[in-house]
Amino acid sequence: MDSVATPGRTLALVREKGLVPRKSRGQNFLVDANIVRKIARAAEVGPGDTVVEIGPGLGALTQELAARAGLVIAIEIDRELFAALEETLAGRDNVRLVAGDALKVDFDRLVAGILGTGEGRLPTYKVVANLPYYITTPILMHLLTSRFRIAELVLMVQAEVGYRMLARPGGKDYGALSVVVQYYTEPAVVLKVPRTVFYPRPEVDSLVLKLTCRTRPVVQVEDEDFFFRVVRAAFNQRRKTILNALGSLGFEKSKIMEALAGAGIDPRRRGETLGMEEFASISRTLQH
């Protein structure tokens, strides 16, 4: 089928299939072929690459990825969209459609099963996704903390979420999501995407980011789960000093004071001023 990345073709498909885009699932379809090409180029996809696409929608980006990649695995949760995808992607032998919830998918097992390799011999692969707001943080946590064999992710997210992922200590957008993303990856902006290139048109603009997965985290911690508990505690009550915010972890104040002193951190500082190494230092000292 011809490209669906045009307003006319997308609208025709929506009407033909009787589709009602669900706002609750962030179903805003990309209708600009130029943006589609830019996203695919950013992923640097070649004939030797396997790409997993989350939420392919009507298949606009899937079609472009399939023209470049060796294999595209597209995961779609919506049954009606899945049926439409079977038509828009017909004839593309290097595309595998998977009906399911990406939050519940073991990506390594899925890719290994389709490639016919054991998980121990699985090559790295890439992830491309247009993530709706409601699923951005949960899916990122699933993809990054599971330590799947992902080399890089190219994600389109709401602009405000993208800026949170990129934010540095002291900035208004800096938070727990910033720390998680930068702990596991090196994020970079690919392009800004105006709301006008979607149907239906969303209320906000989007940002495409490229997250290059680190071979090892940017800081060393003994217990990642505890490290992220410290991070979440620091940001859950942003107006509190780091001394008081960490009280939610259940430690005596004297223990927290000792940990902060050991890390060389003024207890009057607030969580949003702390860098990655400072959070790592706090988590290490609190555990001993």
Swiss-Prot record:
<dbReference type="InterPro" id="IPR011530">
    <property type="entry name" value="rRNA_adenine_dimethylase"/>
</dbReference>
<dbReference type="InterPro" id="IPR020598">
    <property type="entry name" value="rRNA_Ade_methylase_Trfase_N"/>
</dbReference>
<feature type="binding site">
    <location>
        <position position="28"/>
    </location>
    <ligand>
        <name>S-adenosyl-L-methionine</name>
    </ligand>
</feature>
<comment type="function">
    <text>Specifically dimethylates two adjacent adenosines (A1518 and A1519) in the loop of a conserved hairpin near the 3'-end of 16S rRNA in the 30S particle. May play a critical role in biogenesis of 30S subunits.</text>
</comment>
<dbReference type="InterPro" id="IPR020596">
    <property type="entry name" value="rRNA_Ade_Mease_Trfase_CS"/>
</dbReference>
<feature type="binding site">
    <location>
        <position position="30"/>
    </location>
    <ligand>
        <name>S-adenosyl-L-methionine</name>
    </ligand>
</feature>
<feature type="binding site">
    <location>
        <position position="101"/>
    </location>
    <ligand>
        <name>S-adenosyl-L-methionine</name>
    </ligand>
</feature>
<dbReference type="GO" id="GO:0005829">
    <property type="term" value="C:cytosol"/>
</dbReference>
<dbReference type="InterPro" id="IPR029063">
    <property type="entry name" value="SAM-dependent_MTases_sf"/>
</dbReference>
<dbReference type="InterPro" id="IPR001737">
    <property type="entry name" value="KsgA/Erm"/>
</dbReference>
<feature type="binding site">
    <location>
        <position position="76"/>
    </location>
    <ligand>
        <name>S-adenosyl-L-methionine</name>
    </ligand>
</feature>
<dbReference type="Pfam" id="PF00398">
    <property type="entry name" value="RrnaAD"/>
</dbReference>
<feature type="binding site">
    <location>
        <position position="130"/>
    </location>
    <ligand>
        <name>S-adenosyl-L-methionine</name>
    </ligand>
</feature>
<dbReference type="InterPro" id="IPR023165">
    <property type="entry name" value="rRNA_Ade_diMease-like_C"/>
</dbReference>
<comment type="similarity">
    <text>Belongs to the class I-like SAM-binding methyltransferase superfamily. rRNA adenine N(6)-methyltransferase family. RsmA subfamily.</text>
</comment>
<dbReference type="GO" id="GO:0052908">
    <property type="term" value="F:16S rRNA (adenine(1518)-N(6)/adenine(1519)-N(6))-dimethyltransferase activity"/>
</dbReference>
<keyword id="KW-0808">Transferase</keyword>
<protein>
    <recommendedName>
        <fullName>Ribosomal RNA small subunit methyltransferase A</fullName>
        <ecNumber>2.1.1.182</ecNumber>
    </recommendedName>
</protein>
<keyword id="KW-0949">S-adenosyl-L-methionine</keyword>
<keyword id="KW-0698">rRNA processing</keyword>
<keyword id="KW-0963">Cytoplasm</keyword>
<feature type="binding site">
    <location>
        <position position="55"/>
    </location>
    <ligand>
        <name>S-adenosyl-L-methionine</name>
    </ligand>
</feature>
<keyword id="KW-0694">RNA-binding</keyword>
<dbReference type="GO" id="GO:0003723">
    <property type="term" value="F:RNA binding"/>
</dbReference>
<keyword id="KW-0489">Methyltransferase</keyword>
